[in-house]
C-alpha cells in the first residue's frame, strides 16, 4: 500500500484536471470503488479511458418540436404544412426520432417529416399508425448529419382521414459532432 497523497485534492482539482499520479496514493482508485464494472484497471491503464473519449460520449444534442397546439397550448387538429424551423448552432449526427400525438389519428396514418434546408432526412418517413399515439418506429434515415447553420424544419405530410390527430410532439435524438 502506498503513501497518502502529499496534498489535499479538491473537487476543482478533479474538474480542471490538475490531479496527477503524484497526488494519488498507490491503488487509491480501484474497480472496487467504481460502481460501473465495465471500467476495468486494464482499460484505464491501457489508455482506453481518456478525457477526450469521456467528453465525446456525453455530447447529446437532443431537441423537440411541438405541432398541433394553439397559442394557449390547447390541442388543435393537425393540417398538412410546415410547422416551423430552427437554425442549428453546431454540427450534429441524428440517432433517432420519436413522435407522439396526444389525440391519435384515425382512418389514415399521421406522417411527419424533418428536413435539412428543405430536403428530407428520411427515405421512409416517420408515421403514427391510425388509432395509435406513438410513432411506429419504422422510419429510415437517408441523411444522418447536419451542419452548423443548417435550417431544420418540421412538417406534417399526412393526417388521419377521419380524425386528423392533434398535439404532435417530435423529439430528435442527436449527438454533437
What are the roles of these predicted feature ranges?
Residues 1-62:
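Fibrous stalk/shaft segments of extracellular and virion attachment machinery
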Residues 154-162:
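Short beta-strand-plus-loop segments that form exposed binding edges in beta-rich domains
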Residues 22-25, 32, 43, 49, ...:
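Secondary-structure boundary/capping motif
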Residues 56-111, 161-177:
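Beta-sheet-rich sandwich/jelly-roll-like modules and their strand-loop junctions
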Residues 100-148:
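Terminal beta-strand-rich extracellular "head" domains
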Residues 18, 92, 147-150:
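Surface-exposed loop/turn positions
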Residues 9, 14, 44, 49, ...:
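Hydrophobic beta-strand residues in large extracellular and virion-surface proteins
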Amino acid at each position: 500500500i502506498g503513501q497518502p497523497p502529499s496534498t489535499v485534492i479538491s473537487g476543482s482539482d478533479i474538474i480542471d484536471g490538475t490531479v496527477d499520479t503524484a497526488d494519488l496514493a498507490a491503488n487509491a482508485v480501484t474497480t472496487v470503488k467504481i460502481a460501473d464494472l465495465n471500467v476495468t484497471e486494464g482499460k484505464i491503464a491501457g489508455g482506453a479511458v481518456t478525457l477526450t473519449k469521456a467528453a465525446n460520449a456525453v455530447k447529446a444534442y437532443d431537441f423537440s418540436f411541438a405541432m398541433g397546439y394553439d397559442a394557449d397550448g390547447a390541442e388543435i387538429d393537425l393540417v398538412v404544412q410546415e410547422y416551423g424551423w430552427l437554425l442549428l448552432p453546431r454540427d450534429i449526427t441524428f440517432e433517432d426520432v420519436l413522435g407522439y400525438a396526444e389525440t391519435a389519428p384515425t382512418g389514415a396514418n399521421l406522417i411527419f417529416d424533418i428536413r435539412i434546408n428543405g430536403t428530407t432526412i428520411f427515405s421512409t418517413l416517420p408515421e403514427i399508425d391510425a388509432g395509435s399515439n406513438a410513432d411506429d418506429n419504422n422510419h429510415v434515415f437517408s441523411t444522418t448529419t447536419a451542419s452548423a447553420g443548417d435550417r431544420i424544419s418540421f412538417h406534417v405530410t399526412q393526417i388521419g382521414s377521419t380524425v386528423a390527430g392533434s398535439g404532435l410532439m417530435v423529439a430528435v435524438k442527436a449527438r454533437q459532432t
